Swiss-Prot record:
It comes from the Bacteria. GO terms for cellular component: cytosolic large ribosomal subunit. Belongs to the universal ribosomal protein uL16 family. Keywords: Ribonucleoprotein, Ribosomal protein, RNA-binding, rRNA-binding, tRNA-binding. The gene is rplP. Pfam families: Ribosomal_L16. Part of the 50S ribosomal subunit. This is Large ribosomal subunit protein uL16. CDD domains: Ribosomal_L16_L10e (cd01433). GO terms for biological process: translation. HAMAP family: Ribosomal_uL16.
Amino acid sequence: MLMPKKVKYRKQQRGRMRGKAWRGSELSFGDFGLKVLEPGWISDRQIEASRVAMTRFIKRGGKIWIRLFPDKPVTKKPAETRMGKGKGAPDHWVAVVRPGKILFEMEGVSVTDAAEAMRLAAHKLPLRTKFVARETSAH
């Protein structure tokens, strides 16, 4: 699973997700991408499940870039614990995404294969997404 090697603070507040993504909203590396359409959290396990689904479909055909990283700790209190007594221990890591963020990029495969691989990856994610392709300009 993806997670930071070292963090300054073990626990974080939940925070708010307002506005659209203004960074990471354009294709940078590949020719095809998966863009998220709504705000939310994507866990390290969901990112890994999406990556595995895509790589299994395209086999050794193309290259995949993961454009998000889970850097926010989510805490959890043990089961059947009374309220109070402080914040729970860090349980897993999530990536905070806002609408417009490119999650994955891909190159070296056909449009149909890329679209199918991204569709398989999107099924593993909790948010609505859309397939995007690079516009090939002739100037």
